[in-house]
């Protein structure tokens, strides 16, 4: 009798696990750049910010920075900030390439925090890393501009997180630890 109860319990757990896996498989993937519900855009003007990342171009003429999840540039001499890359995705940590022609940044546009690269003027943004679970951030260029080193974030129940340094070619790929 106890053996029958054990078999019924095991079969029940298997069925529940299978149904749960099917529900997760059929769940619609959320796209940060295509919100499903209604939303309203709000315009505002700021003259200061906090928790910003700032980088100066190698030629010393331009500053790139993030503010509220968008990336801007401004001349070092002052003037109006220009939006380089913005939208629904949260984009931060811009860094000029050694030759000043490209800017890398962290974006959640692909569903998780990954490293992206765009031209200095904000055009032709391209996702470099394709991480779907571990978050990538704090990207920096190699001196020759061919590689990017970024921190891959790991979390556990015992800590707030730890990181590993990963090397990626600017053409993409899996990267090396």
Say what each PLM segment does.
Residues 1-24:
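Bacterial Sec-dependent N-terminal signal peptides
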Residues 22-26, 47-48, 66-72, 85-92, ...:
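A flexible loop/linker signature enriched in serine peptidases of the S9 family
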Residues 22-43, 61:
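Blade/loop signatures of beta-propeller domains
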Residues 37-39, 79, 123, 173:
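Residue-level signal for pocket-adjacent positions within structured domains
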Residues 39-72:
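Beta-strand-rich domains and repeat architectures in extracellular enzymes and scaffolds
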Residues 55-61, 94-102, 139-147:
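Blade-terminus and WD-like Trp-Asp/Gly-His loop motifs, strongest in beta-propeller folds
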Residues 61-63, 81, 91:
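Post-signal-peptide, soluble extracytosolic/periplasmic N-terminal scaffold domains
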Residues 76:
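Short, conserved catalytic or interaction motifs in soluble domains
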């Amino acid at each position: 009798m106890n053996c029958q109860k054990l078999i019924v319990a095991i079969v029940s757990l298997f069925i529940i696990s299978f149904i749960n896996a099917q529900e997760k498989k059929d769940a619609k993937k959320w796209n940060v750049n295509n919100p499903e519900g209604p939303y309203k855009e709000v315009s505002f003007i700021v003259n200061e910010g906090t928790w910003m990342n700032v980088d100066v171009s190698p030629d010393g003429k331009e500053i790139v920075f993030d503010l509220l999840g968008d990336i801007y540039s401004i001349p070092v001499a002052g003037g109006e900030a220009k939006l380089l890359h913005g939208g629904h995705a949260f984009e931060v940590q811009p860094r000029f390439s050694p030759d000043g022609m490209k800017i890398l940044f962290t974006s959640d546009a692909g569903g998780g925090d990954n490293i992206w690269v765009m031209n200095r003027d904000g055009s032709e943004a391209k996702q470099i890393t394709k991480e779907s679970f571990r978050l990538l951030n704090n990207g920096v260029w190699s001196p020759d501009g061919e590689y990017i080193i970024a921190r891959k974030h790991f979390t556990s129940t015992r800590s707030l997180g730890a990181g590993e340094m990963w090397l990626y070619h600017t053409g993409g790929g899996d990267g090396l630890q």
